[in-house]
Amino acid sequence: MSLRYLPLLAAALLLTACAAPQPRPGEGVDVGEASSLRSLIPAAELEKAASLQYSQLKRAAADKDLLAPDNHPQVIRLRRIAKHILPNAARFNAEAKNWQWEVNLIISKQLNAFCMPGGKIAFYSGIIDNLTLSDDEIAIVMGHEIAHALREHAREQMAKNKLTQTGAAILGALVGGGELFRLGGNLMTLKFSRDDESEADLVGLDLAARAGYDPRAGITLWQKMDAASNGAPPAWLSTHPGGEARIAEIERNLPAVMPLYEAARKPR
């Protein structure tokens, strides 16, 4: 493709975005198609970069005795919750069934969690311990982070960054030459748009409900988060709206996911 057509392509892709429809009772959330912009970034290279950064994180944590072992009670807990959530991941991204999923715990006071492209999940012990998270609340956090990976928000954001910061010609050279992430930044600290964050909230709510975790835990989670941060979003979700707005959006979408929860609920 000629580079002179790339800005026109980007504009056309942006115009394909559409607003999220109203929730339909009992049918789960409908967030539409993922952004076509993500096609500007090769998924395989992004997942390779994510896997490398995740390995580096684990190695650095292990060197400081901060990587929780496999027999740590919270690691066992996190992996059990993930085991319930992940069977529904392909509903939002068919490629998820081919990802090499990992779940690990970093011993840190940070209120943080993430899921990198390709299914690399990490929780920091601070978000579990400081907020005294229930299994349902952990499922909401985990579902949200998994949703970012399933909806390929990092891939979309990097495409936007390249279009904005380096121009269409450089983007074309990067994609064509395989030097994708030299200017890409740290995938663990990549900031998503508010729309992406809101979408991840809804998809995460759906994933948790289908796994048999109470989606109403999103309300208590944000009450705890607000109390811990004096009403300001922590670094974990710094681009989000405040707790009151988030709780209102969760409540608005509960009719779409509560029947899923009721159908999936079983003793744990």
Segments predicted by a language model, with ranges:
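A Zn2+-metalloprotease active-site environment signal
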Residues: 5-6, 18-268
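Sec-dependent N-terminal signal peptides
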Residues: 4-12
